[in-house]
């Protein structure tokens, strides 16, 4: 950051402060992770200088022979990771990947079946405040009130009732495995396309820790950060028959020039994800999440659906007489970063919520293991149960500091 320091002290100081925040706090936001230095180097490379509208071998600018190599590496590695026919690595985000699939196969007003945001879905799965809910007729499905898990029979009944052109599977706050084969059966029963948004679980899918949606779905979208531990960006995988439609939907449909420095970082992260080290890392993410959930349960913290099958846990804080907003602030004050989150059948607004969402991808990258999960659960319990007790909060903050000093970030 030395060049930034010389050129712009204000930006440098903000970057330095953020570096300190990441070092000094425990990152439990489920959608965040820490990239490797190699990925970071690619992101900050000279490839940011190159415009490359189009696709490898078919660009609208000259001088693209080297960025073509980079994009082909990213595409080939993505296909190898997930066993896909086709990969488009140009989407700037997961939201744009979803938008591209919608525009490739839908007309405005078409009916789509997606997961309710309050039950664990995503804004781009039909929220009325999002383009998806404004352009298309989204109808939602949710979880069973008793089990707080997906009820596939209910999803099938809803699909038969509304006859969607597209079914969207995948979630942003659902801690259980998703049966993609069952979603394929449901889609086939109503002659619908199936799109899976695996943004949260892509890293787990790549290593076999979660069922792979690629053999079942017509389209699979994802972000490249989160459990995949790449740069912030998006990607679309699809069957060969949809490749041209998908590519056209991205460019020239909704994007212009691709971010070649980000695509380079994607390529690097995909190579990392193909390694045995990443497989071990991914396995540890799930082990840590399960252990953290068990430890929190022993502390008397209610876990939505009773546990987790992936990297994510959704905590219901209402039995503690708290809101998600208050819980998030209390934890942040002692050095644990989370986010307030709605839970199924939540009575609070999205700005208040009844829960918090946590995940283990970032802390696992940092080196935290089973003993640290038990300690984190104990600290969370102490903080939430005594959120107005200064002595208890001071103790919690000191215990957080002991953990962050033990596991240095970007040493």
Swiss-Prot record:
Question: According to the lineage, what is the superkingdom?
Answer: Bacteria
State whether keyword Manganese applies: no
Pathway(s) where this gene product acts: One-carbon metabolism; tetrahydrofolate interconversion; Amino-acid biosynthesis; glycine biosynthesis; glycine from L-serine: step 1/1
The modified positions for N6-(pyridoxal phosphate)lysine read 226
Q: Which reaction is catalysed here?
A: (6R)-5,10-methylene-5,6,7,8-tetrahydrofolate + glycine + H2O = (6S)-5,6,7,8-tetrahydrofolate + L-serine
Q: Keywords on this record?
A: Amino-acid biosynthesis, Cytoplasm, One-carbon metabolism, Pyridoxal phosphate, Transferase
Localization recorded for this chain is:
Cytoplasm
User: Which InterPro entries does the entry link to?
Assistant: PyrdxlP-dep_Trfase, PyrdxlP-dep_Trfase_major, PyrdxlP-dep_Trfase_small, Ser_HO-MeTrfase, Ser_HO-MeTrfase-like, Ser_HO-MeTrfase_PLP_BS, SHMT-like_dom
GO molecular function, a single term: pyridoxal phosphate binding
Q: Where does (6S)-5,6,7,8-tetrahydrofolate bind?
A: 117, 121-123, 241, 349-351
Q: What is its EC number?
A: 2.1.2.1
Tell me, what's a Pfam family for it? SHMT
Q: Which residues form a coiled coil?
A: none
| One annotated Gene Ontology cellular component of this protein | cytosol
Site positions (Plays an important role in substrate specificity): 225
Q: What is its main location?
A: cytoplasm
The Swiss-Prot or TrEMBL record lists the needed cofactor(s) as: pyridoxal 5'-phosphate
Gene Ontology biological-process annotations: glycine biosynthetic process from serine; tetrahydrofolate interconversion
Family, according to the entry, reads as follows:
Belongs to the SHMT family.
Q: What does this protein do?
A: Catalyzes the reversible interconversion of serine and glycine with tetrahydrofolate (THF) serving as the one-carbon carrier. This reaction serves as the major source of one-carbon groups required for the biosynthesis of purines, thymidylate, methionine, and other important biomolecules. Also exhibits THF-independent aldolase activity toward beta-hydroxyamino acids, producing glycine and aldehydes, via a retro-aldol mechanism.
Provide the assembly information.
Homodimer.
What this protein is called in its record is: Serine hydroxymethyltransferase
Its gene? glyA
